[in-house]
Structure formats: C-alpha cells, structure tokens
Amino acid sequence: MKNLIFKLFIAASAFMIMSCSSSVDNKNVITINAGPQPKTIDPSLNTALDGCYYIIHTFEGLTTKSKDGKIVGGVAENWEILDNGTKYIFHLRTNAKWSDGKPVVASDFVYSWQRVVDPAVGSQYSFQHEPVKNAKAITAGKMPVDSLGIKAIDDYTLEVVLEAPTAYFLDLVAFTTFYPVRKDIVDKYGDTWILNAETYIGNGPFKAAEINQDESIIMVKNTNYWNVSEVVPQELKFVLMQNETASVAGIKEGSIDFSRILPTQDIQSLMKEGLLQIKPMLASYFYCLNITNEVLSDIRVRKALALAIDRNYIVEQVTKGGETPANAFVPYGINDAEGSFRENGGGFFDISAENYKKNVEEAKKLMAEAGYPDGKGFPVFEFKADPGFHISIFEAVQQMWKEHLGIDTKIVQEEWAVFLQTRYDKNLTMCRGGWFRDFNDPINFLGLYASYSPNNYSSYSNAQYDAYIQTALTTGDQKVRMEAMHKAEELLVNSYAIIPMYFYTEPLLVNPKLKDVYYDALSMHKFTYASKE
C-alpha cells in the first residue's frame, strides 16, 4: 500500500508540473525547479539562493553580468570613478523601464538602498551596503536613513559616496540587494506586493505572469526591458517543489528542463544517463555551533566535534559530487591581493585521510579534559537543518560522533522558510550553514562573523576579529586588507565557532536539449539566453 501511495504521489507531482506548462515541447518555454516556495522574492529582503533565481530574472541592478560572466552596465549605461575611488557617478539608461512601462530613475535606487539599511525594515543583508558612506551607522540606529551616501543628481544621474575605495564595488552592485524596487508599489501594498503578479513590478528581462503559492511562479518576456532583443525564452516556468524523485521523473519525461533538487545518492547513475552536470561553485558548507550554550562555550568540546568528522568519507561516500574537504572557511577561487586567498592562506588543521585516526585520538582527549570521557554526561543536542542531502550528511556525522566520542544527537528537520527564521532567531544549538559568494572578495564570507552581523548564527563575538573586519572594510590598500582578512579567518576557524565541512560543487539535473544557460559560480544561473534544441 505504501508503495502504491508513493507512486500515486509521484504521478500527481508529474501531472502538476505538466499542468503548469501549456506546451512542454515549446522550445521557447524553460521549466525550472529551483526548490520549494521561497521565503521572499523581495530584492531588499531576500537572503537565500533560491530567492535569487526569481529576482535576477525580474529585476536588474546598476551593473549586471554578461553572457561570459563579465561585469557590464545594467541600468547604468556608464559611470565615472572619482575622488580616489570613493565616489561613483552612474549615468542611467534613458530607455530603462519597469515592467509596467514607467521609467527607471535614480530616485528608485536611492529609495531602495535606503530601505535596505533602514533598521525599521530589518533587512538581514544590510551589511552588504557597508562600503557605502554611513550605511553601518544607519543600520545601528546612530544616523538617519537619508544620510546614506547615495543621491539622485537628476532622473538619470546617480551619485554614490563610499567609506573607502572598494575594489569590488561594481561587482557588488550587480547583486540582488542593490536592485531597485518601486516606492509607490511598496507603500501601497506593503509586504504583500511580492505575492501577486500584478503588483510584483520589476525592471528585468522577464515579468511575473502568475504567482501561485507553493505551486509555481511563471514569468514571460518583459517587452519593456531595455535589452529585450537579447532575451531568448518567451516564458520561464518555475515549479516549486522539494521532491527529489519527482524532479528526476520530470527531467526524464521532459516536463522539467533544469532542477537544483535531486537525490544526491544517485549522482553517479544520473551522470551516466546524461541527465546530470556538476558545476564549480564558490561556496562553503559548514556547521554553526551556538557558543553561548554552556557546553559548547568550551572550545575543547567544539574542537573535538570538528576533529571527529571524517570529511573525506563525507565527500567520497555521501555527497559524491566532487566537493573538496575543508579546513578553512573562504573557498578556493576567491581572490587575494595576488593569487588565490585560499591557496595563500592554506588550511588550519589536518584533514588528510591518513591523519584521521590521530584527529580522533585528540578529539577523545579533548572531550575527557572537558569532563566528558567517552561521552559520559554529555547532553543530547539537537541539530537543525532543512530536508534533503543535509540530513544524509549529518546522519554520517552523527554516527562518527557516536562511535568515536560516545555522544548522541537528535536531528530536527524544518521546512526551508522555517529553518531560515530559526537561524536568524538563533533558536538553535547547532545547525547546518552554507554561504555562496555574492561577489569576489573574502569579506563576503568573513564579514558574516562580525559580532554585529545578523548572519552570525554561532553568536561569535571577538573584538580583534571585528577590528580586522573593520580594517578590511575601510582601507583601500589591498595588501593591508587581505592581511587583515587572513588574520580574521585564522581567529574564526581556530575558535571552532563554525566547523568547516567542504567547499561546494553543484550537481544539477539538466535536460540534454537545454543550451545556452549562463552557469554562474555563485549558483545564480541565468536562463535569459537559454533555449532548447
């Protein structure tokens, strides 16, 4: 009976996917599964990768990425860099329009950036704006919102003043948190403006046609987009689902063209079938430990937990996607003043397969010193994560901790939106974490663990660490910046407030007929130029 019910569920899922598409054979319609219902698709408030999928197709910032991944003008046609790199003058395209036909003007960016840093709004990504003059003081409630270093000179000229020269600024403003939103729309509809296609007004290559809660988001080509002639698909159809088996079924029958959701245990077989591709990704996977917890406040316990994990087993036997075991936080591919930040910085503890037994012995010794010999007296901690491969990974870790340290843990699964709120509220003892590069600079990772960061889920607080981060944010000397960030990373990793697990790759289910997708190392893949053979 259970098998019959499961088969009926998969059939129903496939029917739902097909019913979302009026013509699955239409080469101008791309059907995508980026995951279940996103928590938000508001550019100013989104903090999750899945939300970015929808936002990058319906909105556009001052800059954007070309087909080959280079930073080029988006709404801004060109710009000037003045005052030793601390002032930018952006000249906006006069033919840039919102999807309802209204022009995109400089004041739209002023409103949107001020909205992000407004403490009353509470954007969790407000830290991204810290290079902008006064942003940090505003989010701390020490200065008024209108003191932010952004000003509309006229409708098509925007001035931005920075705290210090910021080499990655043009890359930064291509990120979703810097996209414009419409003040009149937000004022009129409040938080509900993102829930209906009629009010979800953007300025990107596509516009919302349907928003069906927990089912689908359907987009059509935005004829008011300034560069509409380069947009290939007529429609993008996002099916909102978590079911891995249904995703595979959809790819095989042609009702889905692309899916982030897949059964990781089947990676090798799906590759052999030609249905799966593995893409590089600049991202870190790690565990967050709440160091305000009485037991986890002891660094000996945290270090023991980290050392008792066999990362090589995880990537070879569990994830199987070509990931790299991690003994640091910032991933490979992030730039240093010269060369690679990761290669220059190296690792902070030995994670080689041949050294694992030594790590386990040290972990046992540390637990005994902390008062928990063979796990005696150690409490049963909850580990929180969203469903999917995160659970499979922790089940392996759970067994390692039980076998080598004698401790028990309990897995608590939470749906995606609930889990995001749990982490933000720090309602946890330990949980899974992951960070995908927003722009190519180590500060994008290391800034997360400044004491004031809303994304500091471990409640890590270190005055010296904050000082290093402040140096990285306020000096224009790249060598000084990078030296400070190397020192910051060393402090963070050696605190074991986080447990680095591995550096990501990204396995994706892809219809073999799908071509010309822009695959991004941030995992914000674009379908603007995609088509099907």
Question: What kind of feature is each model-predicted range?
Answer:
Residues 508-533:
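Long beta-strand-rich cores associated with HINT superfamily self-processing modules
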Residues 91, 110, 121-184:
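Surface-exposed binding/hinge segments that line
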Residues 351-357, 408-421, 444-512, 533:
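Extracytoplasmic/peripheral linker and loop segments enriched in polar/acidic and small residues
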Residues 324-369, 387-390:
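Structural transition elements
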Residues 223-269:
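Ligand-site clamp/hinge motif
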Residues 33-83, 201-202:
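N-terminal lobe/hinge region of extracytoplasmic solute-binding protein
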Residues 155, 162-231, 235, 243-245, ...:
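Gly/Pro-rich hinge or "lid" segments in bacterial periplasmic/extracellular proteins
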Residues 213, 356-360, 364-437, 478, ...:
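Ligand/substrate-recognition segments at binding pockets and active sites
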